[in-house]
Amino acid sequence: MSISLLCCAAFPLLWAGPVNAGVTQTPKFRILKIGQSMTLQCAQDMNHNYMYWYRQDPGMGLKLIYYSVGAGITDKGEVPNGYNVSRSTTEDFPLRLELAAPSQTSVYFCASSY
């Protein structure tokens, strides 16, 4: 019996702003077994209201998972199934993978804007 693994790479997507400001995304890399859960953290220090989570599958463009227009306000994007988000503060927008599946093997991007 083989063990199937799900791999995701998380890279911050930075937007223009003040010097030394940006989006911080952790962890940078993570490998999960099928069925495991994990949270990708995203924090921004630019006081932006809008925050976004995207995924990019091999050979494809970006797909919006979830977005937020302010603290306490979140909405689904194109591919929300299997994910959850929360936005308790302006700075933080964590993305939770509930039960890792091979179809979620992807590069994940967090972004913010005014």
From Swiss-Prot:
This is T cell receptor beta variable 6-6. GO terms for biological process: adaptive immune response; cell surface receptor signaling pathway. SMART domains: IGv (SM00406). The keyword Iron-sulfur does not apply. Residues 22-114 form the Ig-like domain. GO terms for cellular component: plasma membrane; T cell receptor complex. V region of the variable domain of T cell receptor (TR) beta chain that participates in the antigen recognition. Alpha-beta T cell receptors are antigen specific receptors which are essential to the immune response and are present on the cell surface of T lymphocytes. Recognize peptide-major histocompatibility (MH) (pMH) complexes that are displayed by antigen presenting cells (APC), a prerequisite for efficient T cell adaptive immunity against pathogens. It comes from Homo sapiens. PROSITE patterns: IG_LIKE. Its main location: membrane. Transmembrane segments: none annotated. Residues 1-21 form the signal peptide. It is found in: Cell membrane.
